[in-house]
Amino acid sequence: VYNTAVGYDAGSRITTGVQNTFIGGLSGDANTTGNNNVSVGKSSFSANTTGSSGTAVGAFALLANTTGANNTAIGNSSLAANTTASHNTAVGLGALGANTTGTRNTAVGANALDASTTANYNSAFGTHAGSSITTGSLNSVFGDYALAATTTGASNSAFGQSALGQNTTGHSNTAVGQNCLYGNTQGLRNTALGLNAGAGVTNGDNNTMIGEAAGNHSVATTVGNQNTLIGSQTRCDAYNSNTTVAIGYDVAGTGGYTTLGNAGSDIRALHGNITWATVSDERYKKDIVDSTAGLSFINAL
């Protein structure tokens, strides 16, 4: 039946399971009908009974798995609590270590997603990436300690070391850059791009901050909503400003106004409905030439 077992009690209860490889003391000890499993390490896959197509490499990897299928655990204690969940991938010490029934998660890095229990469709790459997520789903995390404090927050995307690092329940946020939106805890639908962009936001919603330290100056936007800040060190002039638009370098915008310019130069602040006019004036044109078409040309039309 093409089973291989090496180690004390390894694969000792196989009845009809085929094409299994169990190496290590108690490896695959409870397996009865599970097929196509590979387990290397002490007590790895030791509770599995009918789960199939699993790979466990490392002491206690997939330790509690019983019927879960198509799981891959590489690293000591990775996916150790998994019981019936399927289609999970964990690479690194303790990665997805608390997962029980959550499915289709990918964790790469020591302790990545290690608190996740029933969450689904999370991807985390980096040491402690998403390490506090318990039930939050549909998160994408790339970077050491990115989204590290999130528990139930969902649909967040964090790219960069410590991006969204203190987020707990906030959802639908996007942070690209080291420390981006780092201080956000409960804010929703914020977007930050650039080193330290939006790092001071805590509970603000629907903010867009693009540029190094945008929204994170001496007066950081913390609870303001619907602000758009574009340019390095652009910011609001109050921590609770709303509907601010600031575009430029090191410029502070005021709630309800559109502010354009750079520090040390002319800055223009616009307010209310703005009408743009297209002028037709010789003063604003160049490369003017005479028209050779006269009345005869017009009469011929």
Describe the function of each predicted region.
Residues V1-S280:
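Glycine- and small/polar-enriched repetitive beta-structure motifs of secreted/surface proteins
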